[in-house]
């Protein structure tokens, strides 16, 4: 299965039980910041943004004072899972990033999608990739 198929079929899909509700943007990115696959409307990811995210996975709390920046958008960092998941909030939307052995699975949402729904979609794929050794 191609990385693009994971984005299209597992991240940009309808939320379970909520037809028509889906993430706004999604991407799978290598730990080095290289984009493996992304939704059609994903922004350009800057190297300094990816460096900050990877630093936060290695040093939880690193992004809390400055916020999480991705694609030029700033998110307030909210409780995640140290070393495994970073979550952010901006207005009525937000972001979830799940770290796997080789990649970062990113999902961005806006209402009516809820933070919990975004977490479920992103973390489910991330957990699957971890189980596959990826």
UniProtKB/Swiss-Prot annotation:
**This protein's UniProt keywords:** Actin-binding, Allergen, Cytoplasm, Cytoskeleton, Disulfide bond, Phosphoprotein
Post-translational modifications reported in the UniProt record: Phosphorylated by MAP kinases.
Which residue positions does Phosphothreonine occur at?
114
A single GO cellular-component term from the record reads: cytoskeleton
Q: What molecular functions are annotated in GO for this chain?
A: actin monomer binding
One Pfam family this sequence matches: Profilin
Where do we find the motif Involved in PIP2 interaction here? 84-100
Q: Quick check: keyword Phosphoprotein in the entry?
A: yes
The keyword Cytoplasm belongs to this UniProt entry's keyword annotation: yes
Subcellular location as annotated: Cytoplasm, Cytoskeleton
Q: Which domain of life is it from?
A: Eukaryota
Q: List the disulfide bonds.
A: 13-118
Q: Which Gene3D superfamilies match?
A: Dynein light chain 2a, cytoplasmic
- Tell me its family: Belongs to the profilin family.
User: Quaternary form?
Assistant: Occurs in many kinds of cells as a complex with monomeric actin in a 1:1 ratio.
Question: Which purpose does this protein serve, as stated in its record?
Answer: Binds to actin and affects the structure of the cytoskeleton. At high concentrations, profilin prevents the polymerization of actin, whereas it enhances it at low concentrations.
Anything else known: The variability of the residues taking part of IgE-binding epitopes might be responsible of the difference in cross-reactivity among olive pollen cultivars, and between distantly related pollen species, leading to a variable range of allergy reactions among atopic patients.
Name the chain's protein.
Profilin-3
């Amino acid at each position: 299965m191609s990385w693009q198929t994971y984005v299209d079929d597992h991240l940009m899909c309808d939320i379970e039980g909520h037809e028509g509700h889906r993430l706004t943007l999604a991407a799978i990115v290598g730990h080095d910041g290289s984009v493996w696959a992304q939704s059609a409307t994903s922004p350009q990811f800057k190297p300094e943004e990816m460096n900050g995210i990877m630093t936060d996975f290695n040093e939880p709390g690193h992004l809390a004072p400055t916020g999480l920046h991705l694609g030029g958008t700033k998110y307030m960092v909210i409780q995640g899972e140290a070393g495994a998941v970073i979550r952010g909030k901006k207005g009525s939307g937000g972001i979830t990033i799940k770290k796997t052995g080789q990649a970062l699975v990113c999902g961005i949402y806006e209402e009516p999608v809820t933070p919990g729904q975004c977490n479920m979609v992103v973390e489910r794929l991330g957990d699957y990739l971890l189980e596959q050794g990826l």
